[in-house]
Amino acid sequence: MVKEIKRDYYLEQLIKREGNGLIKIVTGIRRCGKSYLLRTLFKNHLLENGVDEKHIIEMAFDLFDNIDYRDPKHFYPWAKEQIQDDEKYYFLLDEVQLLDEFVSVLNGLADKKNCDVFVTGSNAKFLSRDIATEFGGRGDEVHMYPLSFSEFMSCYDGNKYDGWNEYITYGGIPLVVLAETDEQKMNLLDNLFQETYISDIVKRNKIRNVGEMESLLDVLASAIGALTNPNKLQKTFKSVNNSKITATTIIWRILF
């Protein structure tokens, strides 16, 4: 049986935004629990409060079964077909960045008086500054983080001292927290770092020298809690790797 992780703060953020006429957008790093929040915790809240399941319309755009619906010419007519009466409908749309022309589509749904739209979005297309401009004031962001220590303890079987050691070692990514062995946790973290987080940074910022970026991240990760001096880092890269990276470039990459 999969343990339930409590995300009460974020659930409350969605609940208090119901019916506000805006597009509720859950953002955050990959694997921090956005899909679970929307399609499990929030959906259960709706059902427990009397919402008919037929009035909860779900779509996970990352599933292969739904790949055709990434085309707005397929998805939008399908979405309208789900609206059968004047009662309120809740649209819970997961990984909506995979939907082509998602801004126009979401605005179209939000324009309907009996539609309440909630979505999750990952990667480069859903930074806070982009939401403010792309949605023209109609996007209402709920930014989600990995598990806090109290959330971590909601699914940890041991005492708080052992829990703290586990938490500061492996962090609060739910998938990692629920892994059973240290080896599984390390493999998951390594895969997330290499295949997901690095990939997003490189794609969004069109970085050509990926190896240099990875080296910088290794240096920063080894000095957490210490002051960062871009000029010293630049000299280190020059002496160790004979790199031509500038202090200005290092500053920009830290800001990524």
State what each model feature region is.
Residues 4, 150-256:
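Interdomain hinge/linker elements that couple catalytic modules in large macromolecular machines
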Residues 26:
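Hydrophobic anchor at the beta1->P-loop junction of P-loop NTPases
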Residues 35:
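Walker A/P-loop
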Residues 57-87:
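Short glycine-rich substrate-engagement loop in P-loop NTPases that contacts/grips substrate
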Residues 84-102:
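Conserved P-loop NTPase "ATPase switch" module shared by AAA+ and STAND
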